[in-house]
Amino acid sequence: MLLLPLPLLLLFLCSRAEAGEIIGGTECKPHSRPYMAYLEIVTSNGPSKSCGGFLIRRNFVLTAAHCAGRSITVTLGAHNITEKEDTWQELEVIKQFRHPKYNTSTLHHDIMLLKLKEKASLTLAVGTLPFPSQFNFVPPGRMCRVAGWGRTGVLKPGSDTLQEVKLRLMDPQACSHFRYFDHNLQLCVGNPRKTKSAFKGDSGGPLLCAGVAQGIVSYGRLDAKPPAVFTRISHYRPWINKILQAN
C-alpha cells in the first residue's frame, strides 16, 4: 500500500488515509482529558488543517511529525472547539522539533515536539500526560484509548466535541498489509472485526494505555477499517529527553 504525506492525500485518495478521526466512539466527559491539545496549523501552501496532540510539559506538546506547518496555535482546556470557554488556553508554538529521520514516504519516525511560547497554566482542565520509558514495550492484547475531534465516520464531518474510543493493541501481523509497518517503531492498533478506529483529521493524538501515552496516531486505511498505525513512543524516549533537556 502506497503511503503519502498528508498534503498529498487528496490527490491520491485511492492509496491510503491519515489516521486521527474517532469512529465508533463516544463523547468524553468535558475536561476529563486535560492533557489533550487541539492544533490549528497553517501549512506552507496556505490552507489550514488541524491535528491533535498532548501536553507533556508545561511548555511542550507531543504530536505527529506530519502535523508540521508554517505556524501552529495550540488550544488547551477545550472540549467543544466551536465554543470558547474560560478554561481555554491558546498558545503559540515558537519551535517545531520534527524527528530528524521522519520519512514522508514510509511515515517512519512520525513524531514531533512543539515548544510553546509561554508555559501553560496547570488547572483542572489543563494538565500533563506521562509517557513511557525507553524499555516500556507495551504488549499486544492490551486495551487502550484514543481521543480526538475528528470525523465520526468516513463521510461524516468532524466532531465539535472531544470523542474517545477504546481500541485493542494487535499483533504485528495484523498490520502486514501496510508495506512499511515496523513493529519496533510503531504499534498496530484496532481489532479488524470491529468498526472502531482512528481515522484521518486529528492525527497526533495520544494512545493511552493504563494512564500512560504509549502511541501517537499516525495513519490508517482510507475506508477507516482497523487496524491503524501509531508511532511507538517508547522507542523515541532518548530523543524526547534530549530535546527537553536542551530547551
UniProtKB/Swiss-Prot annotation:
**GO-annotated molecular function:** serine-type endopeptidase activity
Q: Which GO terms describe its cellular component?
A: cytoplasm; extracellular space; intracellular membrane-bounded organelle
Q: Which residues form the active site?
A: H66 (charge relay system), D110 (charge relay system), S203 (charge relay system)
Q: Kindly indicate where the leader peptide sits in this chain.
A: 1-19
User: Which sites carry carbohydrate?
Assistant: N80, N103
Q: Which domain of life is it from?
A: Eukaryota
Give the reaction(s) catalysed.
Answer: Preferential cleavage: Phe-|-Xaa > Tyr-|-Xaa > Trp-|-Xaa > Leu-|-Xaa
Q: What is its main location?
A: secreted
Keyword set, alphabetical order? Disulfide bond, Glycoprotein, Hydrolase, Protease, Secreted, Serine protease, Signal, Zymogen
Propeptide position ranges: 20-21
Q: Which GO terms describe its biological process?
A: proteolysis
Organism name: Papio hamadryas
This one is known as Chymase
Q: Which CDD domains match?
A: Tryp_SPc
InterPro entries (alphabetical): Peptidase_S1_PA (IPR009003), Peptidase_S1_PA_chymotrypsin (IPR043504), Peptidase_S1A (IPR001314), Trypsin_dom (IPR001254), TRYPSIN_HIS (IPR018114), TRYPSIN_SER (IPR033116)
Protein location? Secreted; Cytoplasmic granule
Q: What SUPFAM superfamilies does the annotation carry?
A: Trypsin-like serine proteases
Gene name, Swiss-Prot/TrEMBL: CMA1
Q: Species lineage, top-down?
A: Eukaryota, Metazoa, Chordata, Craniata, Vertebrata
Tell whether Signal is among the UniProt keywords: yes
UniProt domain Peptidase S1: residue ranges: 22-245
